[in-house]
Amino acid sequence: GVAGSVVASRTALSADTPADSALATKLAGSVYYTKDNPGRWSAKAGGHAPVVESRKGMVMVTTPHEMNGYEHYIVKHTLFDKDMKVIGETLFDPMQVKAAVSQYEIQDYSGIAYALSMCNLHDCWLTEFTI
């Protein structure tokens, strides 16, 4: 086999998504999902795409999806910088929490970032935001 990096070709974007965004690949809507590219989960975008509030280095991520025990729940939130390096992560136990809400204090990074919300049934959802 061939070792190396994966090349992801660019795809059609909403007017709000910059061409150099990590969301600007054909992977959006197939490997991971966004509000603009929900792929096969088009009816699920409203409850699965992470909602992000960012103010002065404080980031709050909410996934408006109910936690239904281990049957259907949000597994985790992960924050990435513009280079897709992890800058924060929260795992959820659906038997302990009723809502997928995570908070992060990010002091050493500013710029474009991504919030991932992973559902145990409906895959990974990504939202771009600015810290």
Where are the regions a protein language model picked out?
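Short, surface-exposed ligand- or partner-binding patches at beta-edge/loop junctions that are enriched
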Residues: 110-120
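Generic detection of short hydrophobic beta-strand segments and adjacent strand-loop junctions
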Residues: 90-92, 104, 127-131
